[in-house]
Regions:
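Alpha-helical scaffolding within the catalytic cores
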Residues: 52-56, 152-158, 195-197, 235-238
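Active-site environment of divalent metal-dependent phosphoester hydrolases
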Residues: 24-27, 77-79, 107-115, 176-179, ...
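Active-site-proximal beta-strand elements of phosphoester/diester hydrolases
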Residues: 12-26, 165-176, 212, 273-278, ...
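Non-catalytic terminal accessory segments
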Residues: 1-13, 311-456
């Protein structure tokens, strides 16, 4: 039986939601061959992140209908100390302009070993980075934890009273999942116990709960569920069921840089929503307006697109269109390099957390697959997965000779930008899912987790 909605007499509350700002201090170096090489394989703006974030913050401040801003992690590029210092000053300025700011940190905000990449001419150098993630709690204490009505210091999670009848659960899932010495995203047993206690307290006090965490709890597409398993929160299927059945129905997430809203319904009939937002400095460069209206049993979500960035040369294009060409040009080059230039591929895969050295070691496998993929047509795909797709030859006659690579590039663009022209009923969707299921079944048969294997 579905839960009663808590805070059902509340007036609507609007929240501005941002994530994955990935601020980079120019003090780390922005010129020379080493920097140019890093920028060429990045899926996000690096040296001009300050300009983009300032433009985004200006847009937030133009909206006087709410004073609440929440940020779901990855505040910096790679945890550089100078990046943190400068970004914190930007957040302080945001508060001075009338915003209440609530932050959690995440994967890119610290570095084991305490160093990150910087650039000096032709050389990549080391720059100081935050080494102990718990130092981030003190660094960002003025952005949420200082207002907390309850905290879980080990995970760096906290609860704040946003407004009468509304509580924000800021749940830091980074390296929080620790069974038998493992370390990964998710929630430890002790953290889950604390969360459930806080949900029970919210229920007793008739408080509507809105939550944020960094890693996704619902895959933004069936394709991502297969290729991006390693980027999902650990135990996300179980955890989201527990949350939904305990009255937590809406989670704001980041990490993927994908603009998406997905939901699942539990066995008990409770709905859980994962509202993901793109990175401000990526593609798409978005922010969200989230308006919660428990009285009318709805949550409205609007997209804010960053289109104008003063001081940034975008070749006279709106910033979002500029980033689309930048990012998807890189995706096309990656697909081409798979079959033609392994060294170039190895340089670019770091942007997707796949070590270049691992790519080079697998060149014997990747290159023939890449050549095959670049020549692959839907007719050939259909022959491989007739049964899985449920399609007949006549069903695909008009797309039989279309190249799958062109469709993949469009699919990735749709995935990141939040468009869904290829729904479950389309031939392209059925063929692609059929092929991925064939590949996934084969990998499971030989006990190979491709995501874990590639990321080492």
């Amino acid at each position: 039986m579905a839960n009663k909605i808590w805070g059902s007499n509340n007036e609507p509350l609007k929240i501005q939601f941002i994530t994955d700002t990935h601020y980079y201090s120019r003090k780390g170096g922005t010129e020379g061959k080493a920097y140019d090489k890093a920028e060429s394989k990045s899926q996000k703006v690096i040296k001009d992140s300050d300009l983009v974030i300032k433009a985004g913050f200006d847009m937030l401040c133009e909206d006087k209908s709410t004073d609440i801003v929440v940020l779901a992690g990855d505040t910096t590029r790679d945890g550089e100390i100078e990046s943190h210092k400068e970004f914190i000053e930007m957040l302080r300025d945001l508060k001075k302009r009338g915003k209440r700011v609530y932050v959690i940190t995440a994967t890119h905000d610290f570095r084991d070993g305490g160093v990150a990449d910087g650039y000096d001419g032709d050389k990549k150098i080391e720059v100081p980075a935050v080494e102990n993630r718990h130092d981030l709690w003190d660094m960002y204490y003025e952005f949420g934890p200082n207002e907390a009505i309850s905290t879980h210091p080990e995970s760096m999670s906290y609860v704040v009273q946003l407004a009468p009848g509304y509580r924000l659960f800021a749940l830091n899932d980074d390296t929080n999942y620790k069974p038998e010495g493992e370390r990964g995203s998710g929630f430890s047993d002790d953290c889950m116990k604390w969360i459930m206690e806080q949900l029970e307290d919210a229920k007793k006090n008739d408080q509507f709960v809105i939550a944020m965490t960094h890693h996704p709890m619902i895959a933004p597409s069936p394709f991502y569920a297969i290729i991006g398993k390693g980027d999902m929160q650990k135990n996300h299927e179980t955890t989201r069921e527990i949350f939904a059945d305990a009255g937590l129905s809406c989670m704001l997430t980041g990490h993927t840089h994908i603009h998406d809203i997905s939901y699942v319904v539990t066995d008990k009939g409770n709905t859980f929503y994962d509202i993901a937002c793109g990175a401000m400095i990526g593609c798409p460069p978005t922010m969200r307006n989230v308006t919660i209206d428990p009285k009318n049993k709805k949550i409205d979500v609007d997209t804010i697109m960053i289109k104008d960035v003063p001081g940034l040369d975008t070749n006279q294009k709106p910033f979002d269109e500029y980033m689309k060409g930048f990012f998807f040009g890189m995706i096309g080059e990656i697909v081409w390099a798979m079959g033609n230039d392994i060294d170039r591929l190895a340089e670019m895969t770091d942007a997707f957390s796949i070590p270049g050295e691992k790519v080079k070691k697998l060149a014997w496998l990747i290159k023939p697959i890449g050549k095959w993929l670049n020549k692959l047509t839907f007719k050939k795909v259909w022959r491989l997965c007739k049964k899985e797709s449920g399609l007949k030859k006549a069903d695909i006659a008009d797309i039989a000779d279309n190249k799958v690579v062109d469709f993949i590039l469009e699919l990735v663009q749709n995935l990141y930008c939040g468009d869904s022209p290829y729904g479950p009923d389309t031939r392209e969707y059925k063929l692609t899912c059929g092929l991925l299921n064939v590949i996934d079944s084969f990998l499971n048969t030989i006990h190979l987790n491709i995501g874990k294997f590639l990321k080492g």
